[in-house]
């Protein structure tokens, strides 16, 4: 366990008033500070009623104190939690008193950082705490809970252990360079690498799914002016979030709205209509629309059902950047007779609601790419995890190629780089600046 001499303190409950507020202490002076507050006779993991007093002996608040001795606490250090009334004034006074007694104000995420540094959890698990708190729906919360329980980390460790075995074999073969690789178990090494690459590819697919569970799907409504994009956003959101008029080009800026699809969060982005010309403000809106497309998981291409082909032509190559697209023929209620429909398009009316149920179904199907049903063991992941897995996969693929040509030194280097990429996920090979960025994004008191 790493020795961290300072004792830190922070409010651990959410900002604002509430029935209960918690102040958390962690560090070697936690019990002594609690005693100076007037809390005597603390027993391990026993709740004790006490009055919390200031320097003059006046009662700041009363409540429950709980002591978690090291190393059997969240941070691995001496921890005392003071549970009083949820008054911000009283909680701040209690923190100030703890600081006067020798503690210091905790940095954002410092409790979780200490838990990581003391080996109570790895980096992916620490991040899962923040993801669990910020989860926008039940499914994302359950996925974050699994990551906190170590589901993701154990799978990363399994691939990492396989890479370790491979590196040992390849490094040993380098030491016997005069011997052909096959006489040194080269066939078994290649088989092991094939299995490892398969495990890594599956882990990457599952992490992509976990990233979408955490972040939700980013769907951009794109199309020519006056196709009904804003009306469709309002219809899907169930409220008048966007301004709607008969004037083409009403939408000048992007508008984000999160909706729930069977427990999955989908962020809809309304954008300015794409067309040639327009004034300076409209052109800036179109530039932002194209920028949103670059970040989109899904493009919802909204066309006027009365002349969809002309609307398609007007878009040009703007949608080429998005691999996943859903074509929507809006205003189908204005058709005197049903016109020709593209096989991949959905006919809807944002005004009457016609076709919206079908659209919801297709959005649910597209939400996770390979089905909408919850998968056993699905976990939460972040973009940085997915990026690290991509790099690990690329290096493992390169190692396989080098082994085929018996370029052992190059194969060993590629395996090392793959191993390092995986280590970034759990924090076993992470630079200090990366750790600082990650934990600084946490809440104070976590």
Swiss-Prot record:
Documented EC number(s): 3.6.-.-
Cited InterPro entries: G_TrmE, GTP-bd, GTP-bd_TrmE_N, GTPase_MnmE, MnmE_dom2, MnmE_helical, P-loop_NTPase, Small_GTP-bd
Domain TrmE-type G: 216-368
Annotated binding of Mg(2+), by residue: 230, 251
GO CC aspect terms: cytoplasm; cytosol
Enzyme class label: hydrolase
PROSITE patterns named among the record's database cross-references: G_TRME
UniProt-listed GO biological process terms: tRNA methylation; tRNA wobble uridine modification
Keywords for this protein: Cytoplasm, GTP-binding, Hydrolase, Magnesium, Metal-binding, Nucleotide-binding, Potassium, tRNA processing
GO terms assigned for molecular function: GTP binding; GTPase activity; metal ion binding
Residues at which GTP binds: 226-231, 245-251, 270-273
Binding site for (6S)-5-formyl-5,6,7,8-tetrahydrofolate: 24, 81, 120, 446
Function: Exhibits a very high intrinsic GTPase hydrolysis rate. Involved in the addition of a carboxymethylaminomethyl (cmnm) group at the wobble position (U34) of certain tRNAs, forming tRNA-cmnm(5)s(2)U34.
Listed name of the protein: tRNA modification GTPase MnmE
């Amino acid at each position: 366990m790493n020795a961290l001499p300072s004792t830190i303190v922070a409010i651990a409950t959410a900002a604002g008033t509430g029935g209960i507020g918690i102040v958390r202490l962690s560090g070697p002076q936690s019990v002594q500070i609690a005693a100076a507050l007037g809390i005597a006779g603390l027993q391990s993991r026993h709740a004790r009623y006490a009055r919390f007093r200031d320097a003059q002996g006046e009662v700041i608040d009363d409540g429950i104190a709980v002591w978690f001795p090291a190393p059997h606490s969240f941070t691995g250090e001496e921890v005392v939690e003071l549970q009083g009334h949820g008054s911000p004034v009283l909680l701040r006074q209690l923190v100030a008193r703890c600081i006067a007694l020798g503690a210091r104000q905790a940095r954002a995420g410092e409790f979780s950082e200490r838990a990581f540094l003391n080996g109570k959890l790895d980096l992916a698990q620490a991040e899962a705490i923040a993801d669990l708190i910020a989860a926008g729906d039940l499914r994302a919360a359950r996925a974050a809970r699994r990551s906190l329980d170590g589901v993701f980390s154990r799978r990363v460790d399994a691939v990492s252990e396989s890479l370790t075995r491979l590196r040992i074999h390849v490094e040993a073969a380098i030491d016997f360079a005069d011997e052909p690789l096959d006489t040194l178990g080269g066939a078994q090494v290649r088989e092991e690498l094939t299995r490892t690459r398969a495990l890594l590819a599956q882990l990457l697919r599952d992490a992509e799914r976990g990233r979408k569970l955490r972040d939700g799907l980013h769907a951009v409504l794109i199309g020519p002016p006056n196709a009904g994009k804003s009306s469709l956003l309002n219809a899907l959101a169930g409220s008048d979030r966007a301004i709607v008029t008969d004037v083409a080009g009403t939408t000048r800026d992007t508008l984000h709205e999160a909706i729930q699809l069977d427990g999955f969060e989908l962020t809809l982005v309304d954008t300015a209509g794409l067309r040639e010309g327009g004034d300076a403000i409209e052109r800036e809106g179109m530039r932002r629309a194209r920028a949103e497309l670059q970040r989109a998981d899904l493009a919802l291409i909204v066309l006027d059902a009365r002349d969809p082909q002309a609307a398609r032509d007007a878009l040009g190559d703007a949608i080429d950047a998005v691999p996943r697209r859903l074509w929507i023929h809006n205003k189908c209620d204005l058709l005197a007779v049903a016109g020709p429909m593209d096989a991949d398009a959905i006919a809807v009316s944002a005004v009457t609601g016609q076709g919206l149920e079908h659209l919801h179904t297709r959005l649910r199907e597209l939400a996770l790419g390979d089905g909408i049903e919850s998968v056993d063991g699905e976990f939460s992941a972040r973009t940085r995890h997915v990026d690290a897995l991509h790099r690990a996969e690329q290096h493992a693929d390169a190692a396989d190629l080098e082994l085929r040509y018996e370029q052992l030194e190059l194969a060993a280097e590629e395996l090392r780089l793959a191993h390092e990429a995986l280590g970034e996920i759990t924090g076993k090979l992470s630079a200090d600046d990366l750790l600082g960025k990650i934990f600084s994004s946490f809440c104070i008191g976590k």
